């Protein structure tokens, strides 16, 4: 089989794509033309205060509403796949278990936020990305690098934050979408949003239903359905005080394969209320109360289980403006509760734990030098105290180019499965948290019509949790992750281009092997063109091979897929969109499962294959 060097291909494609960008960027600079979409967006996840992308001192990617509409993705993982530093694995197609790796760290070593509220399973430590409907969100921010000093446990590789829409000033704006396509897929969504007299509102609902496709060769179709509702309200008083609330709930089921037909019934929910008070001209105080719920009820041929997490959080954050500088201090209390979680009728040895934290951040501006300094102390009932911190420095070389350097620490909390799983000998209540240190260097160029960003990093992880010879989790391993990311984007004359190249070297220092399920090379190229009433676009996503296991014996080949999209503005309020996924009908797998042969007592691996070529069409009403 011919081996494809995806990095070499990517560099060639990047060069071809960047050539016209550079030529046009010079022309745009000369005539001061403005891009149709902001290329230097405001980012709120990289720090505890908003900053533009070139001021954030972080490696960050923003996916705005326009990009989400163009791609019209079926899942959030479709949006994240191939973004700089991001690797996604799935156990099949729609609604099947998915893992997101950021900068080579584990799927339970990154954080998912929805409008600032964290969502995850405390039993696995990871988020259920596969159950999130992308039509509920109008923006995504991906911040790469440690953020433990801002967000606490598990922010080792990075943070992904999804934002729900806010109502815009004016009369109510309805939106309706109806669509369907391959695998007997049906999608419906509707929303109503607006703002008047200081009150903003957004209401939305969606339904996704599909018969699905096989998740293994010669297997049966595995279906999925998901119903989601969203309410977001806020009011700003004449004094500047603000109150608001958010409620997002998804409920559905997904079929999968576990040595026979199996099904998950799931519920995902986030809810929160907040108040923000301008106590003085320089001091703003914000109090947030929230609850996140992740529930998965599984029925399989050989077992049944219920895993439920309720995380309740109270956070008090204070922002002080001191001239061109800014200081943030706060405190946070959270509690994880497993409720009625059990597997095969056995309950967990412990069902709850709490965490108390205090944090502080300083954003210091001494142009052309800027500094971000942060510190956080966590005291967890289960594994004790952890102190994390970070220091980032930025230097403006000129009006268009800036350098950045940072050092940060983070930790991954042991999960309830690792600490208290009910099967004898399969858990360890004496586990300590995994700890990490990361050094990063970056340089960014920001122009009128395009940008580029290059970053290199090194992460050292200690006390990595792994299974010993008796399959009991222990703190034994160390890992070293080295990598580099190159990204660029442009907007000109109706063209929108974005490209990302990723190199990651995630090594288990004890064995010298690559960490499981991580690719080392990745490429993503998005090209879109507006032609009056029409729009056309394509994405190319490619990755090299990976290993399903830590022993590096189960090799999964690399792949490259092409997705196409088109849109037609039928009337001012009506549009038609069509997408083709996996144009070349490439069969590929990013994860494996295993069957157990009772006759030979052997484990027989099989590939979780992704869906083949698929087409979808949808009609949209609204602005």
Residue positions per predicted region:
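C-terminal beta-signal and adjacent terminal beta-strands/loops
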Residues: 462, 568-623
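Gram-negative outer-membrane beta-barrel transporters
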Residues: 365-370, 452, 456-460, 475-551, ...
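Periplasmic-side early beta-strands and strand-to-turn transitions of outer-membrane beta-barrels
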Residues: 148-149, 161-163, 167-171, 177-179, ...
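N-terminal Sec signal peptide and the immediately downstream disordered periplasmic leader
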Residues: 1-83, 194, 227, 490
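Short acidic/polar hinge/loop motifs at secondary-structure boundaries
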Residues: 117-144
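Extracytoplasmic beta-strand/coil segments of soluble accessory domains associated
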Residues: 77-117, 121
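Outer-membrane beta-barrel signature, preferentially recognizing the C-terminal barrel domain
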Residues: 260-278, 307-310, 353, 382, ...
